[in-house]
Amino acid sequence: MTNAQPKFSKPSKMPCRSWSLEALTTCPASKDSNGDLVPACHGCYATGGQYRYPNVKNLRLHNQDDWKHDDWVDAMVTELDNDRYFRWFDSGDMYDIRLATKILEVMRRTPWTRHWLPTRMHKFAKFKPVIALMELLPNVVVRLSSDGVLGEVIEGQTTSTIIPTISHKRPDMLACEAYERNGKCGTCRACWDKDVKVVAYVAHGQKMLKQVKNLIQTVEVV
């Protein structure tokens, strides 16, 4: 198939564009061994709010078919010609190894663009070699997303986690400052910085705050 036409979102928080897919349906790593959503995905922002609007949803559904075109990599490289920063997946994940391989090629062919890719697909063995190749590229930061919302991290990896409040930040974490900037990144580019090993996002949004509250109460009872 040819004639790929990738479509991009521009999250209000972000200083750049993003390429996204439908949340959860393209997130096989969002569930634990029992088939239940992990805490971080249970409170996912991309399943509510403006992400439910038809025009936003249709963009993600379009991309879910569009990446399968033979010329998708070429189309993405052309689109990123003027992008100095780019985020993959403000919604969804690289659920298919063929997609992951194509994303790697886009990254290789756009050395002028700094790519940030959050993912949970490291849980599956077949994705690990592709992720390792991405991590070798100087213009790419792959952040392995923690499943927890109480500050749990994936030790020894470039990662991100969710914390209940700023007081839960550990010394080895860099807290996302968007909560101090009306939800905006501002001039911060920590998520694209290989030297920043752990980014901690303060829980926000009704769904996530409820999830955090329930887990804290459970821990206190135990």
Give the ranges of each region predicted by the language model.
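Class I S-adenosyl-L-methionine
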Residues: 1-222
